[in-house]
From Swiss-Prot:
PANTHER family on file: BIFUNCTIONAL PURINE BIOSYNTHESIS PROTEIN ATIC (PTHR11692:SF0), BIFUNCTIONAL PURINE BIOSYNTHESIS PROTEIN PURH (PTHR11692)
Family: Belongs to the PurH family.
Species of origin: Clostridium botulinum (strain Alaska E43 / Type E3)
Biological or metabolic pathway of the protein: Purine metabolism; IMP biosynthesis via de novo pathway; 5-formamido-1-(5-phospho-D-ribosyl)imidazole-4-carboxamide from 5-amino-1-(5-phospho-D-ribosyl)imidazole-4-carboxamide (10-formyl THF route): step 1/1; Purine metabolism; IMP biosynthesis via de novo pathway; IMP from 5-formamido-1-(5-phospho-D-ribosyl)imidazole-4-carboxamide: step 1/1
GO biological process, one term: 'de novo' IMP biosynthetic process
Gene Ontology molecular function: any one: phosphoribosylaminoimidazolecarboxamide formyltransferase activity
This protein's name: Bifunctional purine biosynthesis protein PurH
InterPro entries registered for this protein in UniProt: AICAR_Tfase_dup_dom_sf, Cytidine_deaminase-like, MGS-like_dom, MGS-like_dom_sf, PurH-like
UniProt KW Hydrolase keyword: yes
Amino acid sequence: MKKRALISVFNKDGVLDFAEFLVSKDIEIVSTGGTYKYLKENGIDVIEINEVTNFPEMLDGRVKTLHPLVHAGILAIRDNKEHMKVLEEREIHTIDYVVVNLYPFFEKVKEDLTFEEKVEFIDIGGPTMLRAAAKNFQDVTVISNINDYEVVKNEIENAGQVSLKTKKKLAGKVFNLMSAYDGAIANFMLADEEEYPEYLSVSYKKMQNLRYGENSHQSAAVYSSTMVDGAMNTFETLNGKELSYNNFKDVDIAWKCANEFDEPACCALKHNTPCGVATGENSYEAYMKAYEVDPTSIFGGIIGFNRKVDKKTAQEMVKIFLEVIAAPDYDEDALEVLKTKKNLRVLKFHNTPKAEKCMVTVDGAILVQDEDNKLIDEIKVVTEKKPSDEEMEDLLFGMKVVKYVKSNAIVVAHNGIALGIGGGQVNRIWPTEDALRRGKGATILASDAFFPFRDVVDKAAEGGIKAIIQPGGSMRDQESIDACNEHGIAMVFTGFRHFKH
């Protein structure tokens, strides 16, 4: 009995060459619908699926291969005499190669289509054949990825058959794909029904292996969401090396922080912590303000902009060593300047941050929560003195920055510049002291969480702070309010805390 391959693909890249190879090895080809037509038109001797099933395609193509004469030929164990006896009695031909790729649900779910239109891209027959072939991998070679055509061709050419090791690997790739595919469908179907479903299905596809993880002894890779075109899976690298694991984490924060602002803004960042944040009339002014606050820490840092980078800004940035620059666009002459630094990673972003959920792994579990996308609940002035309009602008600026600083976090600022940033401390007074020490001339103070005691207010008064913004909610809020009134400081509550761990 001749060996037989069943080919049914949406993505036809490379399939004609692969089919020609199979025919050259005396392997029969059975195919369906558009694939059958494509192969036939290109001179391939191919059997249409309904010649095997004696049953026509139906329901607008929804039912083509869902038939015992197909699946028995895939699932029969060749060394099982009873299985082979059944095939012989019912004149069922074995299927030795299953070549299937799926309807592009991953791509279509992100497009501007109706719910019903997206549902039509949920593949049924393809996954069923793939799973059947993968289960019976000892007897069937299953190909779900066009990149594996060459692997199979080489083994048949060199050894006359596909090795069991390769068959098992290909089968594993099928179940890996199906897990992601089914997960994407589940998330799509439950999107408006359950915020936190009983089973968490995450669907990500590998973008690339990374040189190493957070440290050189840790292996790492980066994966792209199949459901969302976010900022970090759609950017272009215009210059420099591939991003490292730490680069990915840092760029994410720098880009998010810069995009908190409506006006032109720049966020300079090191080790996932902002070291300079400022707004200005343009990217140049914002960068220079951020740089001048801390010209030491910015060395080797990541720079995020929310506006196009011009030549003048580029000329300033290449004066120091930087790891990455992230911006929505670059003037051509700016790009020429930046490319003089061959190792400087220059990224062009196409999407603003849009994450709605964030996940963190702990040992044996995963934590899922809403992304911290809200800044304030409402502004409530709680002191005798009210902040001026200028102070209120700076208070909101400070709260936008403090969101991105490790808790406990304090930011002091003036005129759209984060002059002092203190964070990552186990009490609130230490980051206050750090921020004030660095932030000479600051007039406002922003805190990521409430004040358990009045000590922060007292320190702020010593440092010349005129207005404070914090969430409120402490049992001792009144002590802090009284302290502000004593010092003539305005204070507002926002109702929202911004812990970052």
